[in-house]
Amino acid sequence: MYRSRLGNDLSDITLDYVSSIDDDAAITFYDIVGSQAHVLMLYQQKIITKSDAKKILSSLESLKDETFDSSSGAEDIHELIEALVIKRAGMSSGGKMHTARSRNDQVVLDIRMKIRDDINIICNCLLDTIEALVSVAKNHQKTIMPLYTHLQQAQAGLFSHYLLAHADVLSRDFQRLYGTFERINQSPLGAGPVGGTSISIDRRSTAKMLGFDDVVENSIDATSTRDFVAEYVSMVSILMTNLSKIAEDFVIWSTSEFSFIELSDEFTSPSSVMPQKKNPDILELTRGKTSEVIGNLTAILTTVKGLASGYGRDLQQIKSSIWSTSKISISALLIFKSMLLTLKVNEKQMKKVTESSNLIALDIAEKLVQEGIPFRVTHKIAGSLTQLAHLSKKPISKLTPSDIKKSVADTKVDPKLVLEIISSITVVSSLKERKSYGSSGYDEQKRMISDRLKKINDFRTDLTHRENKINSSLEDLKKQIDEII
């Protein structure tokens, strides 16, 4: 239909090569709604008659329930929809639908509408997952576990503290995506192919109809720039990387060697040959799919970095990367929420491992600091105690007075003071005395949980307001269309 300048049609193999009709299934609805807003604006600006608008809008409305044939011969969904409108409304009316519009502003409109909906879905899923983390944390405020650095036991901690850490990380993912929405929710419609149009359209009118906050003003920028796509996929890549980190922890902790947690059967797979196996395949796939999302980002950046200003057909290729990114992240968040809420925590094993380790070493050093001894001296003493415990194959709490005396050699510290401090410290007392803001201390858990629940509520309120604004605009658009048809 678009080949008026060219004499011959594309061969079947060439058409298959250039066609994006399969990828365009994800934006069909947005293309129809965007076209309806454009036609309504053309009528309001007296560019087309009410009779023409009625025929076009009725045809577009009927297409919302249509099942499209990917073997139609159209290069993309835009051509297919216009061809169907012309077939139903006639060329004299349907042929006016594309007035003052190009596929260049049309496709980027569809992509922006699709991504903004995906962001709202992901943000809702994020809040559900964050809420699940906080909910599980609330039930494990006294569940003792070792905390790790370099995958080596570092300090005694609480499982709630671990879960809240990831709740905070995902909250930042929410905030990043929430902010990205503001830059995506700008309408490119009316920018034309690249330099605008001589026809008296109203770009702000269509932007308002479709729930956009504003327009992408510069027509070159509006049609050719895909920085908003790169930003969106980048934000989701960070989100998936954060989920992958949780997945890695849970894969390790669900092993027989750790036995800290057990995943529900619905999130594991058996071996094809070893009947005793319970493999964390879902978590492993999360790591793998994170790589896929990062690959999508790389594909997008690699595509756009080589383009001159103005639209290039290369940009057609990034759509599948966008859809894949959205699908993977939404599925991952839905799975993680359910997985967290069905997680079995082996509290006894966590505590046993914590108490059998020398995780009170830093507490000993800090107690000595409170006696006025320089930290570097106390660090040396605690390190010596740990080494002696390791060599004698017993915990620090079981060291003899003779051992302790060796640990303070070359210092002026009284070994009796060290013995007294060791005798007073347990894992539980350590956590009770942990007072720093945001620490693993018992008191901090209650405060942080309360604070996070409030933040989740505030986030939901803001998100609902944003969704309602878009829905209200689209409902108003539908009413205006219904008045005409």
UniProtKB/Swiss-Prot annotation:
SUPFAM superfamilies xrefs: L-aspartase-like
Enzyme superclass (EC): lyase
InterPro entries given in the database record: Arg_succ_lyase_C, Argininosuccinate_lyase, Fumarase/histidase_N, Fumarate_lyase_fam, Fumarate_lyase_N, L-Aspartase-like
Gene Ontology BP terms: arginine biosynthetic process via ornithine; L-arginine biosynthetic process
Recorded catalytic activity of this chain's protein: 2-(N(omega)-L-arginino)succinate = fumarate + L-arginine
EC number: 4.3.2.1
A GO CC term attached to the entry: cytosol
Protein's cellular compartments: Cytoplasm
Chief location category: cytoplasm
Keyword Cytoplasm tagged: yes
Family according to the record: Belongs to the lyase 1 family. Argininosuccinate lyase subfamily.
HAMAP family hit by this protein: Arg_succ_lyase
Entry protein name: Argininosuccinate lyase
